[in-house]
UniProtKB/Swiss-Prot annotation:
Taxonomy of the source species: Eukaryota, Metazoa, Chordata, Craniata, Vertebrata
Name recorded for this polypeptide: Interferon type B
Highest taxon in the source lineage: Eukaryota
Keywords: Antiviral defense, Cytokine, Disulfide bond, Glycoprotein, Secreted, Signal
PROSITE patterns in the cross-refs: INTERFERON_A_B_D
GO cellular component: extracellular space
Amino acid sequence: MTANHQSPGMHSILLLLLLPALTTTFSCNHLRHQDANFSWKSLQLLQNTAPPPPQPCPQQDVTFPFPETLLKSKDKKQAAITTLRILQHLFNMLSSPHTPKHWIDRTRHSLLNQIQHYIHHLEQCFVNQGTRSQRRGPRNAHLSINKYFRSIHNFLQHNNYSACTWDHVRLQARDCFRHVDTLIQWMKSRAPLTASSKRLNTQ
């Protein structure tokens, strides 16, 4: 990761605190050339970061329903806010000091760097003007994403951050990158972009 004096956990907290301070004045009229492949590259890094646990895992009878209505936004600005929130939570989760020992730290840091850079790009899409009341997306959307990731955090904590628990959470992270791709593709359809997106078929 880029060298700095802040721990990944502290930086992730700062990122999560930053979002409410953003205005909802959306200024990104065009997605960048590399945006089309962001989710695909992230899935590749996630797969390389998290190999299967050393021991077989029992079947996990637990689900984390994602608020699918957030993927059907008709507003480009709101789609960007949702994407930003998902990525901030993913950064926070994957920078945990409790990730399994068999995960590949160097690749995980590459993944965190990629997420961090894209978060920074999305933050630049918001212009700092307007009152505090204009600086938040819909409260229900904010709460539903928080609830989703809080349930994942509670699951990890309840199971003492075991390797098998993290493997189940890895699948949730994989789904989140696919949700991010859905949002990016929707935003791409509202703006010219020459890069063609690769299919997200990583298992």
